[in-house]
């Protein structure tokens, strides 16, 4: 399978590249900078169309800097335009804040415990998801991480959810970045959630 990864130098993207490569896929890694990657800007539809041509799946794991959260929506729009009608599937890494907290009717960002400092990125992720949901002429999958996503160990194990946070017996919602990458590459291979959002956790 030919997979193109946007945001290949980031925490999630670099692990997606490693996971997909280890499985024997042909991986093209793209970044705004870095000598070992193709140069490209995911917020430019022409770059998206040009670099994605000839691939089976695009996995986008870009993340904006603090204060530039609006780039999430701009980048999603660019990906949708650049891939429209191409036959290339899009697996897009999103946010967790719009997931519903189990046992409540509130989303994570609506819960009283949600840090105010994270509201800008949370709102941007919610807008990103709303935009992607309206996309036509494109097979997309939106993947929300759990509440806690940190570097750790690859176990190859995870559980899936859809609109609710995946939590363990202690009520924690987490996964290692390595296992999150496993879930992303699994979806690239299996195409189980076309035009759907899903989430994962332990």
Place the predicted regions along the sequence by residue.
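N-terminal Rossmann NAD(P)H-binding glycine-rich loop of SDR-like oxidoreductase domains
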Residues: 3-23
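Conserved glycine-rich Rossmann-like NAD(P)H-binding loop of the short-chain dehydrogenase/reductase
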Residues: 24-32
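Conserved Rossmann-fold NAD(P)-dependent oxidoreductase catalytic core, especially the SDR/UDP-sugar
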Residues: 77-120, 130, 134
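Substrate-positioning beta->alpha
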Residues: 124, 173-185, 196
């Amino acid at each position: 399978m030919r997979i193109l990864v946007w945001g290949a130098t980031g925490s999630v993207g670099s692990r997606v590249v490693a996971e997909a490569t280890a499985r024997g896929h042909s991986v093209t890694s793209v970044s705004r900078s870095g000598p070992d990657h193709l140069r490209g800007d995911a917020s430019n539809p022409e770059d998206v169309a040009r670099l994605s041509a000839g691939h089976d799946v695009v996995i986008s794991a870009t993340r904006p800097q603090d204060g530039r959260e609006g780039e999430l929506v701009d980048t999603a729009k660019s990906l949708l335009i650049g891939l429209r009608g191409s036959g290339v599937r899009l697996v897009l890494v999103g946010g967790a804040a719009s997931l519903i907290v189990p046992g409540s009717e509130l989303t994570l960002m609506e819960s009283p415990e949600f840090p105010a400092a994270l509201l800008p990125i949370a709102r941007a992720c919610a807008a990103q998801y709303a935009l992607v949901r309206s996309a036509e002429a494109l097979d997309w999958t939106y993947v929300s991480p759990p509440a806690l996503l940190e570097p750790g160990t690859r176990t190859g194990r995870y559980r899936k959810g859809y609109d609710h946070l995946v939590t363990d017996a202690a009520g924690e919602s987490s996964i290692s970045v390595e296992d999150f990458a496993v879930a992303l590459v699994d979806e690239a291979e299996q195409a189980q959630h076309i035009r759907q959002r899903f989430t994962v956790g332990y």
